[in-house]
């Protein structure tokens, strides 16, 4: 999914990053790893840009409240007999094949309904990174199913100094990559928004609140999502250093 009217960074899929648009970089990262790839958008400018670099694109409604809803509409328009639909945010230009394979591997368990990824925070990261509300945290159970996602720091360590929290517990940062069994995608998009979802502005809480299980895979790869113009600057620096 890639929409034009982002509140924090309008037109970000069309922002230039190292001579290519952000959406082209995302598309090039995922083709070859999945059986098929489409950009689902609500804007003719994005549609034209995708066609210009030879990508596949599907026009969807401007009224969707989430990327998951947009994915489902695109899925119904594309048709085909897909077992699993992978939802890759259109602002993740450095998504890696290893991450896509990790989320695909979650479906080797026949009971998996929905899957996503996390990355462990490291003990040497500054506490401000853990506090960042734009980087949701995840807690999981023994079977690596998500218990909860929050913009707050979870868990709260009652008997430890805050500066020692990352040393005393492994915290997990959510990576905004989802995959769903096709029939589950149909079901969850029919659900009304939930109270937890509205409180945290995290759509995955709707699924948990309605009893769906979210299998969690681990990635050690750092991702750089483009949410703000400042993020784009960081991405440009990352790209220069990598090359």
Residue ranges with predicted function:
Residues 80, 165-243:
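Conserved alpha/beta core of the MobA/IspD/sugar-nucleotide pyrophosphorylase nucleotidyltransferase superfamily
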Residues 34, 80-82, 109-113, 212:
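Short, high-confidence coil segments that cap the C-terminus of an alpha-helix
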Residues 1-41:
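N-terminal glycine-rich phosphate-binding loop and ensuing alpha1 helix
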Residues 96-188:
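Conserved core of the sugar-phosphate nucleotidyltransferase
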Residues 41-42, 95, 180, 227:
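A conserved hydrophobic position in a structured secondary element of the catalytic/binding core
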Residues 38, 44-102:
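Short phosphate-binding loop-to-helix
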